[in-house]
A protein has these predicted regions:
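Short secondary-structure boundary/capping segments
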Residues: 9-10, 38-39, 77, 86-87
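Short, flexible, basic/aromatic active-site loop/helix in glycosyltransferases
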Residues: 29-55
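Short, hinge-like loop/turn segments at secondary-structure boundaries
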Residues: 7, 34-40, 104-106
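Conserved beta-loop-beta/alpha segment of the NTase-like Rossmann-fold superfamily
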Residues: 1-33, 50
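Conserved alpha/beta core of the MobA/IspD/sugar-nucleotide pyrophosphorylase nucleotidyltransferase superfamily
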Residues: 47-116
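Short, charge-rich amphipathic segments
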Residues: 1-4, 37-41, 96
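Generic beta-sheet signal
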Residues: 20-22, 40, 88
Length: 116
């Protein structure tokens, strides 16, 4: 979806940092180490982060130099330093391919979009 990149380039102009994402559809549960549910976050405020993640180069470079906390992505690094990050609309088909199951899903999306 070329619109994702265009939305990202527009969003990054607001604060120098922007991440694609989609509103979550699932109910998310917080769970203790013992497996007990400890909370249910408000789904209306939860988005699943995707790529692209777009940053002004100098801002990202500085974050990599200053961040000392463990983080899962560059956006979290900027968040940990107190810098705002803008979320922009991605697409549910824009999945992260990490496992063989993900690859099967991605292949289905590609076949459906190209009418194979």
């Amino acid at each position: 979806d070329p619109g994702i990149l265009q939305r990202g380039l527009t969003a990054v102009q607001e604060c120098g940092a922007a991440v694609a994402g989609v509103p979550v559809k699932d109910t998310i549960k917080q769970v203790s180490p013992q497996g007990q549910i400890t909370g249910t976050p408000d789904r209306d405020r939860l988005w699943a982060a995707q790529t692209p993640q777009i940053f002004e180069y100098a801002l990202l470079w500085q974050a990599h130099q200053r961040c000392t906390q463990p983080v899962t992505d560059d956006a979290a690094m900027l968040e940990s330093l107190g810098h705002p990050v803008k979320m922009f609309l991605g697409a549910y088909e824009n999945i992260k391919v990490t496992t063989t199951d993900d690859l099967v899903i991605a292949e289905r999306f590609l076949k459906a979009s190209s009418n194979i």
